[in-house]
A protein has these predicted regions:
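Ferredoxin-reductase
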Residues: 129-216, 270-272
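Feature marks short, highly hydrophobic, charge-poor N-terminal signal-anchor/signal peptide-like helices
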Residues: 1-10
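Transmembrane-cytosolic junction motif
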Residues: 18-39
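Membrane-cytosol interface motif
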Residues: 33-54
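Iron-sulfur (Fe-S) cluster-binding segments and ferredoxin-like electron-carrier domains
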Residues: 53-64, 75-125
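Short, charged beta-turn/beta-strand-edge "cap" motif at the junction between a beta-strand
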Residues: 112, 124, 170-174, 221-226
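FNR/FR-type flavoprotein reductase catalytic core
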Residues: 200-293
């Protein structure tokens, strides 16, 4: 009897939850809402009811987000100054106490139901959406590929050594985005090159490893705080391995393009010699620049 009561109660709660979701989606009308960004640097109007993340993307504000609204990547953090409603249980596990106190929220979980004021890092205002085509695919090891994107629109990218892009890939529940470091040097502005390890069952890496020359791709960027120290007096020590060599390669080539005499050490970590790649390129670079070890 108790089991039957539990089943009935659970069914009622599930039914009510589904009804509320449907009602909110199709019956709730929040009208026009205004979002004020960074104290008025940008101001845009939209129909309320969707997520803050969707609202930002629709207005070409491409903040980081890996899973498109599932609330588990923690990347889409913004500061809500006004109008975000109460903090949700789906957000609290991913926010520190200090973040919760300062109004940090997950944009994928916050619904736009009224006028809002938010803040995001200034640099995210300059993130762009790129359309490109695959111009090269090269197998580096048994599970790592180098994939080159030729930029179409816009046809140039401006990034700093160490930054990354977010590639859009088709997933079972819709489009997902995955972050990959840029391996091509900053002076190669018409391409973006990635070094990607195939993760068994991974949506993003499987998609990229299956790309062929001529395939269209879409991504946003650049993002990231992992950057080269631009003080020419600072000696650089680069440590990496596997797909983690992508930003290291970008950093090394960018260093010697800008500072011919700057000192740089490279330590390439691997399990076997078969896991080493780009060695010929680095050896050639060391012949041109004796400060590269």
């Amino acid at each position: 009897m108790n089991v039957m009561a539990l089943v009935v109660t659970t069914g009622v709660f599930v039914g009510l939850s589904v009804w509320f979701l449907i009602a909110e989606r199709y019956l709730a009308n929040y009208g026009k809402c205004t979002i004020k960004l960074n104290e008025g640097d940008k101001l845009f109007e939209l129909n309320g009811g969707g997520t803050l993340l969707s609202a930002l993307y629709e207005n070409k504000i491409f903040i980081p987000s890996a899973f498109g609204g599932k609330g588990s990547c923690r990347y889409c953090k913004v500061t809500v100054v006004e109008g975000g409603g109460p903090l949700l249980p789906t957000e609290t596990p991913y926010l520190t106490r200090a973040e919760r106190m300062s109004g940090v929220r997950l944009a994928c979980q916050v619904k736009v139901k009224q006028d809002m004021e938010i803040k995001i890092p200034e640099e995210l205002l300059y993130v762009q959406e790129f359309q490109a085509r695959v111009s090269g695919v090269k197998e580096l090891t048994r599970d790592i590929k180098e994939v080159t994107f030729e930029l179409i629109e816009p046809n140039e990218i401006s990034h700093r050594p160490g930054q990354y892009v977010q590639v859009r890939a088709p997933g079972p529940d819709g489009i997902v985005t995955r972050a990959y470091s840029i391996s091509s040097p900053v002076y190669e502005k018409n391409i973006v090159q990635l070094v990607v390890r195939l993760v068994p069952g991974g949506i993003g890496s499987t998609y990229i490893h299956n790309l062929k020359e001529g395939d269209p791709v879409s991504f946003t960027g650049p993002y990231g705080e992992f950057r080269l120290n631009e003080d020419p007096e600072v000696e650089n020590v680069c440590v990496g391995g596997g797909a983690g060599m992508a930003p290291i390669r970008c950093i090394i080539y960018s260093i010697f393009h800008r500072w011919l005499e700057r000192s740089c050490w490279l330590f390439f970590g691997c399990r076997t010699t078969k896991d080493i790649f780009y060695m010929e390129n680095y050896e050639e670079l060391s012949k041109k620049h004796t400060n590269f070890k």
